[in-house]
């Protein structure tokens, strides 16, 4: 019996499920050594009912192994592509590549891009070469534009000095500031959480030390306790914070105040007492660095003095202080207490304003200025106050007017 040679050496016959994109399905038999290209040709003949419509149709289609989602290579055999019996293959037409743009289209697109492109400096100079020039120093104009919040601090420092001199001439100023100072003392007393203070004193810490620790650590008992342990051997641990005085000193101050308020007090004594009140208010404004922030920034390698300066400039904001230390360190700590030039047009315009002149004779205005220096975020509160708001509004208007001119 005669047997063809290709039948003798033929590989294993596989039955494959073929699915076309139009939904047609059929079984195709092929040996393992059949190439993918040959199998694809047979599948296309099946779809075209025995003949190919286009000789290029083979290259325009592809076979995909459904289970692995692989595109089969035309040059490889079914065995090399690891196709198994009863596998499902998808016959799909390849996507036609997008046609290359014509040269005319490319030129039009490039021209459109050039038309939309912003002009460079040379193009601007060429276009404006015939225009008349004006002697305007733009760099100077930009430099003279000042930030209101930055200048406000300088203005407040200078206005505080003027207000103190004006109020020193008021015979009732001493009594007014005594009441205002008493209110400040009450505010400070209210800042100490009695429950937190009791908790620390029950642990055995002295009351004065516990009070100081709570004030330095924002009323946090764990942080205050840690601070007390760390500073137990510190010789200055019993030293009152700025603006505070021991009970004996407070009693002496009260006695002196009562004596000065007597009928026999002279004008000079009243002025001295008012000066002391001003100093006490100023001491309340003295900066107290956040102990936690100081430790954190010093652990980064910064010097303690630099850290305190950074926190003072940035109102105890640790992140802002860190950026200040890493940056150009502007403004400097020395600039914080520096007032505005008394001979400057801005300051003279502020002093000439009737609303400001009237406000400077009000002790509440001075207290507002002091508070805004310590807490810049409180500016909004004082702007809405019926007594201090008009003064702040006039200062802002004068600044904006002169800043534009």
Curated annotation (Swiss-Prot):
Tissue specificity: Ubiquitous.
SUPFAM superfamilies given in the database record: UBA-like (SSF46934), Ubiquitin-like (SSF54236)
All copies of domain Ubiquitin-like, residue ranges: 14-98
Ranges for region Disordered: 101-120, 235-271
Gene: UBAC1
Protein name: Ubiquitin-associated domain-containing protein 1
Composition bias, Low complexity: 246-265
Pfam families with a match to the protein in the record: UBA_7, UBL_UBAC1
Keyword set, alphabetical order: Acetylation, Cytoplasm, Repeat, Ubl conjugation pathway
N-acetylmethionine PTM sites in chain numbering: 1
Chief place of localization: cytoplasm
Gene3D superfamilies the record matches: 1.10.260.100, DNA helicase RuvA subunit, C-terminal domain (1.10.8.10)
Localization (cell): Cytoplasm
Function: Non-catalytic component of the KPC complex, a E3 ubiquitin-protein ligase complex that mediates polyubiquitination of target proteins, such as CDKN1B and NFKB1. The KPC complex catalyzes polyubiquitination and proteasome-mediated degradation of CDKN1B during G1 phase of the cell cycle. The KPC complex also acts as a key regulator of the NF-kappa-B signaling by promoting maturation of the NFKB1 component of NF-kappa-B by catalyzing ubiquitination of the NFKB1 p105 precursor.
Stretches assigned to the STI1 domain: 353-392
GO molecular function annotation: polyubiquitin modification-dependent protein binding; proteasome binding
Entry's free-text remark on domains: The UBA domains recognize and bind polyubiquitinated proteins.
A GO biological process held by the record: protein maturation
Residue ranges of every copy of the UBA domain listed in the record: 187-231, 288-328
